[in-house]
Curated annotation (Swiss-Prot):
A Pfam family per the record: Neur_chan_LBD
Source organism (scientific name): Gallus gallus
Family: Belongs to the ligand-gated ion channel (TC 1.A.9) family. Gamma-aminobutyric acid receptor (TC 1.A.9.5) subfamily. GABRB3 sub-subfamily.
Catalyzed reaction equations: chloride(in) = chloride(out)
Protein name, entry field: Gamma-aminobutyric acid receptor subunit beta-3
Signal peptide: 1-25
Bias type Basic and acidic residues, positions: 409-423
Length: 476
């Protein structure tokens, strides 16, 4: 019962309000009252001086701003800028434009903006901007009964964005939009973000081919110049570059070309045409990739991350070509010449030895020795012990001054020969063991097959290590 009575009371009190609203709406749309609206607008504009700001001589005008971002069209590393399309709204109160008798907001033609005072807002880091003009100039003026003015524009601006490309393309960039008053100082005008952190909308709708918007920040501050302090609002975007495009377009081709250059290690070393053609092709391909990349980036003095990677791949490809040059030199150049010289020297030594040994015994059966041989025998341990005993051997001189040694007895000769042979065998065994150890530690660089075998292991290992260090450093 009480609920039914309460509903009747609410209906009784709400009915006049609804009637008043409907009557006001009808009165505005009534052709007879359109003249009243026209007279109101004419009255507002009559005597209005756009040269003076609202509350001239009084407190500064507070201008609130909203931005609805339509799109970020382009981020250019070459020009160091980005292009932004947005709906830019400014709010302020002008008591000269307050009106009564019409309980509605008045949305006027965009040409009325030329007859009203508007803030002298400009974009500090702007390079090129324009207000869209299809089909009419995209700007709006809306008046509120209390004198609040909404001034909206659809703007496309290209703003400067100074980028640090040292970690390109694994980088993050910070691009800002600086909004400032050109002529009015903080004594005349103040800027603020209308709605606080919600003053900028549409960021979540933005999709960029190469970037992702990590976050955005709103900043309000005053900056001081020689002519005074000016209000400034900043909208800052933190952009993280998407690596997927560069992996497919740059990194993967470079890796595959580097691996392709290693195929020459499995090609026979005497196939010069195949190995040289493969090496030169891979080097030229890496050069083409480097050239194309430099055309898409500005001419900056420091080295970028992608430059380091491409330079590393180029070095590996170039070293693979040099490896075959070294193999070719060993096989066709230095190696055969050295072997020929060694063979000639060995044959000459054998001939000299056989001829010399035939002339070392005189007619009496004595073995002729040179002074150098006697010195060597005296210096050795075996000869020293035998020289101390005068009964073992006798050294004499003939009339020509040539020293000779008489042959010892058969038993002494056999004993001395066996001891010499044992000592020489032990020395040879020791030298052979040392040489085998050195061969295990150091590969024979005169063997072209060994060079190719080692290259098959060393090149992939070092390239994998290079990739590990590169990605750990730049990703983290």
């Amino acid at each position: 019962m009480w609920g039914f009575g309460g509903g009747r009371i609410f209906g009784i009190f709400s009915a006049p309000v609804l009637v008043a609203v409907v009557c006001c709406a009808q009165s505005v749309n009534d052709p007879g009252n359109m003249s009243f609206v026209k007279e109101t607008v004419d009255k507002l504009l009559k005597g209005y001086d756009i040269r003076l700001r609202p509350d001239f001589g009084g407190p500064p005008v507070c201008v609130g701003m909203n931005i609805d971002i339509a799109s970020i069209d382009m981020v250019s590393e070459v020009n160091m800028d980005y292009t932004l399309t947005m709906y830019f709204q400014q709010y302020w109160r002008d008591k000269r434009l307050a009106y009564a008798g019409i309980p509605l907001n008045l949305t006027l033609d965009n040409r009325v903006a030329d007859q009203l005072w508007v803030p002298d807002t400009y974009f500090l880091n702007d390079k090129k901007s324009f207000v869209h003009g299809v089909t009419v100039k995209n700007r709006m003026i809306r008046l509120h009964p209390d004198g609040t003015v909404l001034y909206g524009l659809r703007i496309t601006t290209t703003a400067a964005c100074m980028m640090d490309l040292r970690r390109y393309p694994l980088d993050e960039q910070n691009c800002t939009l600086e909004i400032e008053s050109y002529g009015y100082t903080t004594d005349d005008i103040e800027f603020y973000w209308r709605g606080g952190d919600n003053a900028v909308t549409g960021v979540e709708r933005i999709e960029l081919p190469q970037f992702s918007i990590v976050e955005y920040r709103l900043v309000s501050k005053n900056v001081v110049f020689a002519t005074g302090a000016y209000p400034r609002l900043s909208l800052s975007f933190r952009l993280k570059r998407n690596i997927g495009y560069f992996i497919l377009q740059t990194y993967m081709p470079s890796i595959l070309i580097t691996i392709l250059s290693w195929v020459s290690f499995w090609i026979n070393y005497d196939a010069s045409a195949a190995r040289v053609a493969l090496g030169i092709t891979t080097v030229l391909t890496m050069t083409t990739i480097n050239t194309h990349l430099r055309e898409t980036l500005p001419k900056i003095p420091y080295v970028k991350a992608i430059d380091m990677y491409l330079m590393g791949c180029f070095v590996f490809v170039f070293l693979a070509l040099l490896e075959y040059a070294f193999v070719n030199y060993i096989f066709f150049g230095k190696g055969p010449q050295r072997q020929k010289k060694l063979a000639e020297k060995s044959a000459k030594a054998n001939n000299d030895r056989s001829r010399f040994e035939g002339s070392r015994v005189d007619t009496h059966g004595n073995i002729l020795l040179t002074s150098l041989e006697i010195h060597n025998e005296v210096a050795s341990n075996e000869v020293t012990t035998s020289v101390t005993d005068a009964r073992n051997s006798t050294i004499s001189f003939d009339n020509s001054g040539i020293q000779y040694r008489k042959q010892s007895s058969h038993r002494e000769s056999l004993g001395r020969r066996s001891s010499d042979r044992t000592g020489s065998h032990s020395k040879r065994g020791h030298l052979r063991r040392r040489s085998s150890q050195l061969k295990i530690k150091i590969p024979d660089l005169t063997d072209v097959n060994a060079i190719d075998r080692w290259s098959r292991m060393v090149f992939p290992f070092t390239f994998s290590l290079f990739n590990l260090i590169y990605w750990l450093y730049y990703v983290n």
